[in-house]
């Protein structure tokens, strides 16, 4: 039961944050490209990789907490269905090349952001563990 509560809480926070970012206007951008959804999904790929690397390889997160963050927060924060809807909207406006670019950039850069999220987590956390070991030796 606890894991469902944590997933729900994480989901509520992720959905609220996504809505906030989605409704934030980027003053220098006025085009058709759905930049806010792209930013949300790319940052979500990065965040999910960091969380999973941290939970699985560095610290042993409680499974319920990991699910609350990964499934709840990141699952509600990112939005594949909105990306699909926005792609269809671009296609309905005969903006086929822009739709193609949107899907391509979303997938390719999503994978890159996930890769760099995993890389960043490993690098930062290995440094933290090294500092912790040095502190323990010094004491």
UniProtKB/Swiss-Prot annotation:
Q: Which residues does the annotation say bind Na(+)?
A: 75, 78
* Protein's UniProt keywords contain Nucleotidyltransferase: no
Summarize what activates or inhibits it: Na(+) is not transported, but it plays an essential structural role and its presence is essential for fluoride channel function.
Indicate the principal place this protein occupies in or around the cell: membrane
Q: List locations, semicolon-separated.
A: Cell membrane
What is any one GO biological process for this UniProt entry?
Answer: cellular detoxification of fluoride
Transmembrane regions:
1-21, 33-53, 65-84, 97-117
**GO CC annotations on file:** plasma membrane
Regarding the membrane, this protein is recorded as: Multi-pass membrane protein
Listed NCBIfam families:
crcB
Write down what this protein is called. Fluoride-specific ion channel FluC 1
